[in-house]
Structure formats: structure tokens, C-alpha cells
């Protein structure tokens, strides 16, 4: 239990370890210029996961702009899109159905909120395992392997459950602190990305303190 608590706490502190200034400056810029910065940002998230797998004691890696960064970002973006697509296709029909009782605008807002929860659950099942495997192997098939991610969750549910809790908490804390400190949403988003990368890396490490195997 102590190891698990330490690992979780380490994920939350990891974004500030070692070279934080340059890493954060470029990361904040990438978030600020979204959607233009989407591919570099997602590519860096993969690179951060890879770094946390290889040297978990170090901080986030330096930004290295390369073809691999953009390619990794493109594969990660495609994986997110594939998890989102079924719910995007359901959004308008559900909004029309709810429109029988609500104003069309509020009906579509309600539909989006109703679909956000199952999409978030699917993303939590797929993205941590897929990202950790893709970061380790570099094989795009790992990034898109939803069935493999689901098997990973079933095989090591305790580890996935703790990692998912870290990711959800990081996004909640990041956005809440950004609002509370009046610094805007940009730092909170980048902080959550870094914490998520470090947490996902725990699923790939050979010596898994979180594993039940």
C-alpha cells in the first residue's frame, strides 16, 4: 500500500521535477495555440510516457521537435478520434430525440453531457494502456488496439483502477487549481497531461508495484 501511495504522489509531483521551466514554457504555448498545437502536444505526451517508463525517477523530458514527435501525436490523435466517433455519431440523433421535450439548443447540450460520461469511460479504458504500449514499442497498432487495452484492464484491473483514479484526479485538480489561482485553464491542462503520462507509464514498467500479478 505504501508503494502505491508513493507512486500516486510521485505522479502528481513529477511535472515539476528537474527542468520544469523550459518544459512548461513550450507546453503552455502548445496548449495555448490549440488546435494548431495538438499534434506536438500529443506527441510530447507519448514522449513523456516513454521517458517515465525508462527513467521514472527523472522529470519530464526535453521537448525535441522531430518527425517522430508529430507522427506519435498523429497516432494518438487518431486513437482519441476513434474513441470519440461513436458518440459523435449519436450526438445529433439524441439531441433530436430530447428536442421533443426541450429547446433544441438545450437538447443538444444535454445530449453532449449524457454522452460525455460513457466516452470518458471508454477513453480511460483505452488510452492509458494503449499509450503506454505505444510509447514502449513505437508500433502504431498498439495505439489503436482497443481490444488489447480492454484485455490489459481485465488482466490487471487494480493497476488500471489506480492509474485511472490518478488521471481523473489530475484533470480535476489541474482545472480546479487553475480556476482558483486565476491563472487560466492552460497550465491546468498541461499539468494534467504530464501527470497522466507518468501514471500511464506505470502500466508498462517491468517492476509494477501496482500489479496484482
Question: What residue ranges belong to the model's regions?
Answer:
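Short, Lys/Arg-enriched N-terminal segments with co-localized hydrophobic residues
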Residues: 1-4
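Interfacial aromatic "cap" segments that immediately flank transmembrane helices
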Residues: 6-32, 63-89, 125-176, 202, ...
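Short, small/hydrophobic-residue-rich motifs at membrane-helix boundaries and re-entrant hairpins
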Residues: 10-14, 26-59, 67-121
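Selective recognition of hydrophobic, aromatic-rich stretches within alpha-helical transmembrane segments
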Residues: 31-54, 103-142, 174-211
Amino acid at each position: 500500500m505504501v508503494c502505491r501511495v508513493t507512486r500516486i504522489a510521485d505522479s502528481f509531483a513529477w511535472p515539476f521535477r528537474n527542468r520544469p521551466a523550459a518544459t512548461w514554457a513550450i507546453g503552455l504555448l502548445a496548449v495555448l495555440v490549440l488546435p494548431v498545437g495538438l499534434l506536438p502536444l500529443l506527441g510530447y505526451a507519448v514522449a513523456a510516457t516513454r521517458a517515465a517508463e525508462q527513467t521514472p525517477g527523472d522529470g519530464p523530458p526535453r521537448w525535441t521537435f522531430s518527425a517522430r514527435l508529430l507522427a506519435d501525436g498523429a497516432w494518438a490523435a487518431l486513437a482519441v478520434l476513434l474513441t470519440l466517433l461513436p458518440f459523435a455519431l449519436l450526438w445529433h440523433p439524441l439531441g433530436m430525440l430530447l428536442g421533443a421535450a426541450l429547446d433544441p439548443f438545450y437538447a443538444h447540450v444535454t445530449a453532449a453531457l449524457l454522452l460525455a460520461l460513457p466516452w470518458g469511460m471508454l477513453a480511460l479504458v483505452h488510452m492509458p494502456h494503449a499509450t503506454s504500449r505505444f510509447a514502449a514499442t513505437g508500433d502504431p497498432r498498439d495505439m489503436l488496439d482497443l481490444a488489447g487495452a480492454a484485455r490489459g484492464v481485465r488482466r490487471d484491473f487494480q493497476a488500471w483502477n489506480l492509474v485511472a483514479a490518478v488521471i481523473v484526479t489530475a484533470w480535476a485538480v489541474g482545472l480546479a487549481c487553475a480556476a482558483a489561482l486565476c491563472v487560466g485553464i492552460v497550465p491546468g491542462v498541461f499539468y494534467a497531461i504530464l501527470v497522466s503520462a507518468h501514471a500511464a507509464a506505470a502500466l508498462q514498467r517491468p517492476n509494477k508495484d501496482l500489479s496484482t500479478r
